[in-house]
Amino acid sequence: MDKLLERFLHYVSLDTQSKSGVRQVPSTEGQWKLLRLLKQQLEEMGLVNITLSEKGTLMATLPANVEGDIPAIGFISHVDTSPDFSGKNVNPQIVENYRGGDIALGIGDEVLSPVMFPVLHQLLGQTLITTDGKTLLGADDKAGVAEIMTALAVLKGNPIPHGDIKVAFTPDEEVGKGAKHFDVEAFGAQWAYTVDGGGVGELEFENFNAASVNIKIVGNNVHPGTAKGVMVNALSLAARIHAEVPADEAPETTEGYEGFYHLASMKGTVDRAEMHYIIRDFDRKQFEARKRKMMEIAKKVGKGLHPDCYIELVIEDSYYNMREKVVEHPHILDIAQQAMRDCHITPEMKPIRGGTDGAQLSFMGLPCPNLFTGGYNYHGKHEFVTLEGMEKAVQVIVRIAELTAKRGQ
């Protein structure tokens, strides 16, 4: 389908891994390389109003080819890959007509197995694009990037009626910074879709409410031989804090609409310790209750400490559940579902146990649910995407554009 695979393989060859804890946006130079490449390709394709901001947001417009009061709609993907696993020297493997069983990843012992990933049973006969076991693939979200670019080429080269189509490619989504610098007014769409989901048919408009919790613990270190009544072990305090957190409300024990507390990192010595949690919940009241719970735990464990020893807790909200914004505009979901059905796809409405740029954008005035890309197992060496799934995503994007035009004519 019009260079879809070629585009995808080109994009994943560029190392665009983002980096957390960096002030600049984009956080890595590699993202600029892909953004500049996309800008050049958009220019060659004949799009207009192409801008690349100093914060690495690339925007462009495919002008309407029909008249009428047709709303401008947008499609958005991010160019960075996760910091969780290497994205350097990605070497994709193409497995045509998958016949089942294990797929060897490279020349080592790594395999992609239907025992661990049963979804493979549903993909027999399809073309799978996998890693070589040494890196992630980057389908999150270069599959989305390639799909949007291919959909633009299809719309540009065929007499398919559409209104103004706005596209944007953002940096640093994986570290939560991309959408913060997104100029919704300049984008000019009434609503948009991120193309950043998973398997074929996924349509997501609910995501976690999210917060980060940083805990600083200051103890008192003395020689252990003379420590009685004097030593305050910061690591012991950290252990007590974590013991108070509900063990059955962790990522590894929850699913669906269940929220969790997740101890993401902990480091320290007797003298000082730091803990970093993330809190997630779909329900706003439960989300607030989880934050209060963490404050109560810190207060309880810190009670009675010497004034020079203390526990300091800082909670920062990261993003909120976009459901409350998207459901105000039900036609956005109706059009996407109809587009999928028209492409012989059964829509699968499911909550995102995570977040997308669309969550932040929805609260910035741009309602923005999430469409599938055809990818699986993101952020690791078992990541893969199906060519057929990517082709379906292109078809759905094109059909959404066409259905929106019909509504406005």
UniProtKB/Swiss-Prot annotation:
Binding site for Zn(2+) 2: D140, E174, H379
Subcellular compartments: Cytoplasm
SUPFAM superfamilies attached to this UniProt entry: Bacterial exopeptidase dimerisation domain (SSF55031), Zn-dependent exopeptidases (SSF53187)
GO biological processes: peptide catabolic process; proteolysis
Record field: catalytic activity: Release of the N-terminal residue from a tripeptide
Superkingdom classification of source: Bacteria
Cofactor annotation remark: Binds 2 Zn(2+) ions per subunit.
Region of interest (Catalytic N-terminal), residue spans: 1-207
Record GO terms (molecular function): metallopeptidase activity; tripeptide aminopeptidase activity; zinc ion binding
Catalytic site positions: D80, E173 (proton acceptor)
Region described as Dimerization: 208-318
Cofactors required: Zn(2+)
GO CC annotation terms, alphabetical: cytosol
Keyword Cytoplasm: yes
The keyword Metal-binding belongs to this UniProt entry's keyword annotation: yes
UniProt-annotated stretches for the region Catalytic C-terminal: 319-409
Enzymatic class: hydrolase
Pfam families linked to this entry: M20_dimer (PF07687), Peptidase_M20 (PF01546)
Record-stated family: Belongs to the peptidase M20B family.
NCBIfam families for this protein: peptidase-T, PRK05469.1, PRK13381.1
Function: Cleaves the N-terminal amino acid of tripeptides. Hydrolyzes tripeptides containing N-terminal methionine, leucine, or phenylalanine. Displays little or no activity against dipeptides, N-blocked or C-blocked tripeptides, and tetrapeptides.
Name used for this protein in its record: Peptidase T
Species assigned in the record: Salmonella typhimurium (strain LT2 / SGSC1412 / ATCC 700720)
